[in-house]
Each structure stands twice: as structure tokens, then as C-alpha cells.
From Swiss-Prot:
Species this protein is from: Coxiella burnetii (strain RSA 493 / Nine Mile phase I)
Keyword Cytoplasm (UniProt): yes
Species lineage: Bacteria, Pseudomonadati, Pseudomonadota, Gammaproteobacteria, Legionellales
Name of the protein this chain belongs to: Probable chorismate pyruvate-lyase
Enzyme superclass (EC): lyase
Gene symbol of the encoding locus: ubiC
EC number(s) on file: 4.1.3.40
Catalytic activity entry: chorismate = 4-hydroxybenzoate + pyruvate
Membership in a protein family: Belongs to the UbiC family.
Main function: Removes the pyruvyl group from chorismate, with concomitant aromatization of the ring, to provide 4-hydroxybenzoate (4HB) for the ubiquinone pathway.
Record's keyword annotation contains Cell membrane: no
Length: 185
């Protein structure tokens, strides 16, 4: 199978790279949080692994239009269905977005960011981009426990609070695709 080694919009991803179930999950335009909860009848668990001001990786700074060594709030999370990792996530929120008047992003705490983004009309979402995560990509760290040579897909999109961006990246475990079905939309 040919590797997709760069971020690309859906129309540039060969249709043969995804099964129908993978396509359904990866291209889902709504709240992934809500879809995961619905699919598992609320049994999925959201875990905040880390929330810290740190330097984003190069591809994140470029996409967000911030300069190195500017720090941003980085949130790393995972969604587990019982013990099975289904989705790992990384959110990068530049300081200017956090500091914007009225921003609800300053005190997210243990909550899922999706509960905030899709409940507030001041947030808009940019286009989704996709890529395969290989061992040399910085996001591989989040899924190395389950990779085992599997094809790992990720998606990312910019959200905007008014005009200020934040980046949401989601890495999908093969277990999600195996343990769920297209009918669980």
C-alpha cells in the first residue's frame, strides 16, 4: 500500500487507501467527541494526559502562523474504550487565542475540547487534512503502543475563535475501525 506522507485534503487522498468505515470516521465533519460517545453508548473515556505551555513542532507553527520559539498551550488527550486506545489527540492553542477577550479556552480542565468547540457559535472550523503517521513523525509517539506496523491515520483542522486559530489533530487507532461500524453515525 502506498504511504500518504504529507498532509492533504480529502480530494487528494486516493479512495483505495480507506475502507468505508475509515472514511466515515476520518471525514466526519461534526463533533468526534459526540460520535465516540454515541458509538459506545457513553462508555468511552476521555483522558487528559498533559496540558503545558511548550513549543509546537515545526509543521504546527507554520500552520498556525506563529514563530519559533513562541510557546503555546499544548493539550494531549486520549479516548479509550475500556482499555483499547481509539483516538489520541493533540491541541495547540497559541497565546493570542487564549488571551482573546471572551475566550472559553483558558479553563478547559479535564473536559473534552469538542464539548466547547461545537457548543459555541464563535468557533468555526477550517478544512480537514489527512496523513498517515509513520515512525518518523512527531505524532507517532501517541500511538506507538498500538502501531505494530499498522497503518495509522490522522486528521487535523484549524478552528478559529473569531479570527484567532487553534489546531486540533486527531490520530486514529486501528482498533477504532475494527471495533466500530459505519452504522454508528
Amino acid at each position: 500500500m502506498k504511504k500518504q506522507l504529507f498532509w492533504a485534503p480529502q480530494n487528494e487522498i486516493p479512495s483505495t487507501l480507506w475502507t468505508a468505515n475509515e472514511r466515515s470516521w476520518l471525514t466526519h465533519p461534526g463533533s468526534l467527541t459526540q460520535r465516540l460517545r454515541k458509538t459506545t453508548d457513553g462508555q468511552i473515556q476521555h483522558h487528559l494526559l498533559r496540558e503545558v505551555f511548550d513549543a509546537p513542532v515545526d509543521e504546527e507553527t507554520q500552520l498556525l502562523g506563529i514563530s519559533q520559539p513562541e510557546l503555546a498551550l499544548i493539550r494531549e488527550i486520549e479516548w479509550r474504550y475500556f482499555e483499547s486506545l481509539w483516538v489520541a489527540g493533540r491541541v495547540v492553542i497559541p497565546k493570542k487565542t487564549l488571551e482573546r477577550e471572551g475566550s472559553p479556552l483558558n479553563h478547559i480542565g479535564e473536559r473534552s475540547l469538542g464539548d466547547i468547540l461545537f457548543a459555541n457559535a464563535k468557533f468555526t472550523r477550517g478544512d480537514l487534512e489527512f496523513r498517515q503517521i509513520t515512525a518518523d513523525h512527531p505524532y507517532y509517539f501517541y500511538v506507538k503502543e498500538i502501531a505494530n506496523g499498522s497503518c495509522i491515520w490522522a486528521r487535523r483542522s484549524l478552528f478559529y475563535f473569531e479570527r484567532d486559530p487553534l489546531l486540533v489533530s486527531e490520530i486514529f487507532s486501528p482498533a477504532l475501525f475494527l471495533e466500530s461500524s459505519v452504522s454508528n453515525d
